[in-house]
Each structure stands twice: as C-alpha cells, then as structure tokens.
C-alpha cells in the first residue's frame, strides 16, 4: 500500500468553469431506488440523530440512517415513517436477537427501504451471515454493510449481497479505536477510501475523518457515493446531546458509538466523549454544505457531482492549512 494520504494532504485542481453561478450545479445523488439532495448522511450515532431529525431529513429529501441503540423502538419507527410516505432507514447489529428482529419484520410485512449493518469491524463472518439473512427475509431492503477498511472486505461483503459498503475504521473524531487497538484507517482514511473504491462494484459510503465541507468533495473524488459525517453534525440546536454552558459559551455533548457513555458501562470502550461548540440550526449547516458542494462542482468544471470524480489532484503532505486552525 504505497502513496498513503489523508484529507488534509490533498488539494483538488480546478478545471475550466462552465456555469455562470454555482446555483446551476446539482448536488443530488442516487442511492438504491431513491434520489437525495446531498451525498451526505449524518452518522447513525445517538448524539447525532433521533426520530425528530430523521423525520426532518426524510421530509426534506436528505438521506438518513437511524441509530440502533434503542432497538425496541425500531418497529414503531418504521411504521411511523412509512405511514407518512417517508423512507425508513434503520441500523442493525449482528447479535442473535437481531436475526429474530429481521424475521419479525418479514412476518409483519414491514420492509425498511434501507438497513445498515453497523459494527466496528465489519469484515467478519458475523456481518456476512447477517447480510445473507436480511437478503433472504427482506429481499427488497437496500443493505449497507460495514465498517471495513480493505478492498478484500469490500469484495466479500458485496459478494455476500451487500448493496453498499461503509468504509472507515476509527478515523472519527470521537473514535479512539486507533489508540486503543493500533488498527484502522485513522490518518489515511482518504487513501483507504480510494483503495476500497477501486475494488468496489457497488456504492461506497465514506465514514469518518471529515473535518471540513471540502472533505466531502475529496471523498467523492476518491470514489464515495455517500459521505457519513459525525462531528460536523454534532452540536446543533436539534441535536440529541445535552447542552451545557461554559464561560458564557454553549456546548453540546458528542460521544462515540462504542463509548462508555453510550453503553452505560466501561467495557470494550472504543469511543470517547467531547463537548462541541453549539452550531445553531441543522438546516443552516445543510444549506451551507450544499452551497459549498455546488462551488466544488463549479471548480471541477461541471454541473453535476460526477464531474468531481475526474479532476486532477496533488498530494501536499499536511501543509494545506499551514498551521492555521480552520474551525
């Protein structure tokens, strides 16, 4: 694996602009049978998404994935979303009761449009078996499987029946897998994405390590169809986390999915908790992301997201911020 780099090591090179205004650029993306306004999905984490935000996103044509940390609420959630004519997109784990849950959905003729199998180390027989189980009982559901960090894993999960794979092991801001285990794609997530995308025949969701809106464009350049983002979506008015005031400033909590705060216990901890500055409304962030991505498309010399996939780039080894703190 030569040529290892991460988001801050790369600059995309502009191509001749063909639009008069960035508003002519189209940021929509298709995943499965549905088209979404942005190639971005808030992380399926407890401090990022809840039922209210899921509903808001679905109503406004953004992709979402509900977290799996209140498993007993999932059936009513699917019913509720579908009764409003919205997509139902849920997460499952790989434990025994999740197999029963999938069978229960089939028995009740409930088919979520999207099911994400979401475990920290997704290149495993446990995930392969779950993909096959879902495909057997709910063949119409679009299955996203992860998380993985190698081309072998992408190929195996696709061959097992996954409709998309989620790439990223530990690059997230509240993820400490890299520190606790020594493993993962932290520090080279963008190169890992590129490596995996070359092997993929189905969509890839880049998950983790996004620190700026420009990183979304870079992810698209290196093969992502969709980009999952945690920290940039944390700390909004609507976010589920707790709000605290410190030195006259407002902050919201944000913690990792395998953290003791989420589990309620100190066992197999691979996540930490932090407080992020209160960011105002989620809608404003989504609009800003869309506008920034429209600008990216115009710099790429096109009118659609795909134009970003063919631009040239340079590797600048950690120098693009010149020591400036951006956010």
UniProtKB/Swiss-Prot annotation:
One of its GO terms (cellular component) is GMP reductase complex. Keywords: NADP, Oxidoreductase. The active site is at 175 (thioimidate intermediate). InterPro entries: Aldolase_TIM, Dihydroorotate_DH_CS, GMP_reductase, GuaC_type_2, IMP_DH/GMP_Rdtase_CS, IMP_DH_GMPRt. The keyword ATP-binding does not apply. Transmembrane segments: none annotated. SUPFAM superfamilies: Inosine monophosphate dehydrogenase (IMPDH) (SSF51412). GO terms for molecular function: GMP reductase activity; oxidoreductase activity, acting on the CH-CH group of donors. Catalyzes the irreversible NADPH-dependent deamination of GMP to IMP. It functions in the conversion of nucleobase, nucleoside and nucleotide derivatives of G to A nucleotides, and in maintaining the intracellular balance of A and G nucleotides. This is GMP reductase. It comes from Bacillus thuringiensis subsp. konkukian (strain 97-27).
């Amino acid at each position: 694996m030569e040529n290892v780099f991460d988001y801050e090591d790369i600059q995309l090179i502009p191509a001749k602009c063909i639009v008069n205004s960035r508003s002519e650029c189209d940021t929509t993306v298709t995943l499965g049978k549905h088209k979404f306004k942005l190639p971005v999905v808030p992380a399926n984490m407890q401090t990022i998404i809840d039922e209210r935000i899921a509903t808001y996103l679905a109503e406004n044509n953004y992709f979402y994935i509900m977290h799996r940390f209140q498993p007993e609420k999932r059936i009513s959630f699917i019913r509720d979303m579908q009764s409003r004519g919205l997509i139902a997109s849920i997460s499952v784990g790989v434990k025994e009761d999740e197999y029963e849950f999938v069978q229960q959905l089939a028995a009740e003729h409930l088919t979520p449009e999207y099911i994400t199998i979401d475990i920290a180390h997704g290149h495993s027989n446990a995930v392969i078996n779950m993909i096959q189980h879902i495909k057997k009982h709910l063949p119409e559901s679009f299955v996203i499987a992860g998380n993985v960090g190698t081309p072998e894993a992408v190929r195996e999960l696709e061959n097992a029946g996954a409709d998309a794979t989620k790439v990223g092991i530990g690059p997230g801001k509240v993820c400490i897998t890299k520190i606790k285990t020594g493993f993962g794609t932290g520090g080279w997530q963008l190169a890992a994405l590129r490596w995996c995308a070359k092997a993929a025949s189905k969509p890839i969701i880049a998950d983790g390590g996004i620190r700026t809106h420009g990183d979304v464009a870079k992810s698209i350049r290196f093969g992502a169809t969709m980009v999952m983002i945690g920290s940039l979506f944390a700390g909004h008015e609507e976010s589920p986390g707790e709000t605290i005031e410190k030195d006259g400033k407002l902050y919201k909590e944000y913690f990792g999915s395998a953290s003791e705060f989420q589990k309620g216990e100190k066992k197999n901890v691979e996540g930490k908790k932090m407080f992020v500055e209160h960011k105002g409304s989620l809608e404003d962030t989504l609009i800003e992301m869309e506008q920034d991505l429209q600008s990216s498309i115009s710099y790429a010399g096109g009118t659609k997201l795909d134009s970003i996939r063919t631009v040239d780039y340079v590797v600048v080894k950690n120098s693009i911020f010149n020591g400036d703190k951006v956010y």
